[in-house]
């Protein structure tokens, strides 16, 4: 018999059963899921990159010729 894994909600820290039946996992509720989405949309959360990484990544995207 296996025990149901429990994680903490990334937004509020409440314990959450991490099962397929929990449609909000790893969040405890739709509210916490939307709070997290809003934080990403307003750039409160960011994925760290080297300062010049974007310049190299997008350097070929813009053609200086008109």
From Swiss-Prot:
Family the UniProt entry places it in: Belongs to the DNA gyrase inhibitor YacG family.
Assembly notes:
Interacts with GyrB.
Entry annotated with the keyword Membrane: no
Alphabetized NCBIfam families for the sequence: PRK00418.1
Q: Which cofactor does it need?
A: Zn(2+)
How the cofactor binds, per note?
Answer: Binds 1 zinc ion.
GO biological process assignments: regulation of DNA-templated transcription
Q: Which UniProt keywords apply?
A: Metal-binding, Zinc
Q: What are the boundaries of the signal sequence?
A: none
- Give residues annotated as binding Zn(2+): 9, 12, 28, 32
One GO MF term on file is:
DNA topoisomerase type II (double strand cut, ATP-hydrolyzing) inhibitor activity
Summary of the function given for this chain in its UniProt record = Inhibits all the catalytic activities of DNA gyrase by preventing its interaction with DNA. Acts by binding directly to the C-terminal domain of GyrB, which probably disrupts DNA binding by the gyrase.
Q: Which domain of life is it from?
A: Bacteria
Give the Gene3D superfamilies listed for this entry.
Erythroid Transcription Factor GATA-1, subunit A
The protein's name in its UniProt record: DNA gyrase inhibitor YacG
Which InterPro entries does this one have? DNA_gyrase_inhibitor_YacG, Znf_NHR/GATA
């Amino acid at each position: 018999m296996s025990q149901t894994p429990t994680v903490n909600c990334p937004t509020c820290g409440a314990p959450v059963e991490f099962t397929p039946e929990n449609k909000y996992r790893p969040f405890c509720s739709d509210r916490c899921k939307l709070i997290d989405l809003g934080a990403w949309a307003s750039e409160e959360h960011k994925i760290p990159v080297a300062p010049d990484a974007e310049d190299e990544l997008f350097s070929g995207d813009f053609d200086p010729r008109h």
